[in-house]
Structure formats: structure tokens, C-alpha cells
């Protein structure tokens, strides 16, 4: 039976959260929606740096890393700025991607356009 995309996405974000916590990150928020700008899958902190993390996963032949597009990164960056401004936070930050391929997790820190 085929998993519904929302359920599969939630399971992937649960796995991503567990991975980040095991790596010493403190997860602050999940699925943060920044008005009309977009959504950030996970906001976490480690070593005085705030991380805005896009989670991509897949089961098929297509590598989910290719779903981290320039358009998606712009939305995450704009949402990150909105988050920090609305919370009055002024710290170093990083936009990252966490790629899940089956049971393999790849963390790509400081993704740029």
C-alpha cells in the first residue's frame, strides 16, 4: 500500500529531528509557517548558530537532494529572516538541508544558491 505524502513527510521529519538531537542540536520549532513567505521544516540551534533546515526524502529512483531548488532555498531564506525579525533575534544562522534516502541521512550545512 502506498503511503500518503503527508504521513511519509511527517515520518521523515521525525527521523530528521531524532538525527539532529543525536548530533547535539536543540530543536526549537517544526513546520514554522512565515505568512506568505513559506514554511521552514525544522528550526534548531547548535553552538550559538540558528539552523533553518529543509528536509527532503524519497523512496524511489529520484534522489531527493534535487528537490532542494533555488526557489525553495529563497523561500527558506526569506522565512528565516522573517522568523528572526519577528522574534527579535540577532544571531548567526545557517540554511541547511537534511536529505533522507531510505535509512540513510545526509546533513548538508550552509546550503547556498
UniProtKB/Swiss-Prot annotation:
One Gene Ontology MF term: nucleic acid binding
InterPro entries: Restrct_endonuc-II-like (IPR011335), tRNA_endonuc-like_dom_sf (IPR011856), UPF0102_YraN-like (IPR003509)
Residues in coiled coil: none
Domain of life of the organism encoding this protein: Bacteria
Pfam annotation, one family: UPF0102
SUPFAM superfamilies linked to this entry: Restriction endonuclease-like
PANTHER family found in the cross-reference section: UPF0102 PROTEIN YRAN (PTHR34039:SF1)
Family: Belongs to the UPF0102 family.
Protein name: UPF0102 protein SUN_0231
Species this chain originates from: Sulfurovum sp. (strain NBC37-1)
